[in-house]
Amino acid sequence: MAEAFAGTWNLKDSKNFDEYMKALGVGFATRQVGGMTKPTTIIEVAGDTVTLKTQSTFKNTEISFKLGAEFDETTADDRKVKSLITIDGGKMVHVQKWDGKETTLVREVSGNALELTLTLGDVVSTRSYVKAE
């Protein structure tokens, strides 16, 4: 099921991302850079291991994980979190927990588009990606 997410995805549109970063506790300067950055996300699937790479002029991150198995992750804004990623109803659901907080990142593919919905409390941000040729 994770194979549906495999590919190279380029950010084309972002809504409410600054508010989401603010809710995470990201500082002003980092939010300014993060808001202007147009990252590329590369998702690779090899057997039961999924690798998710995010590349931008600001920062590159890479995580490898098995669906349904909790793992330690250091986020692009340097939070140390416990992450769990599952496939639920055709969506890739990524839950990050740290310091009594929780955020959910949901990826959904439709054709050559990937929609990422970021939720923290009542703050919701959507980031739209298009698959690279």
From Swiss-Prot:
Entry-linked Pfam families: Lipocalin
- Which Gene3D superfamilies does the protein's record reference? 2.40.128.20
Under the cellular component aspect of Gene Ontology, which terms does the record hold?
Answer: cytoplasm
Binding-site residues, octadecanoate: R127, S128, Y129
Its localization reads: Cytoplasm
User: In the UniProt entry, what is the domain comment?
Assistant: Forms a beta-barrel structure that accommodates the hydrophobic ligand in its interior.
Function statement? FABPs are thought to play a role in the intracellular transport of long-chain fatty acids and their acyl-CoA esters.
Protein's name according to its UniProt entry: Fatty acid-binding protein, heart
Question: Which organism's genome codes for this protein?
Answer: Oncorhynchus mykiss
Provide the taxonomic classification: Eukaryota, Metazoa, Chordata, Craniata, Vertebrata
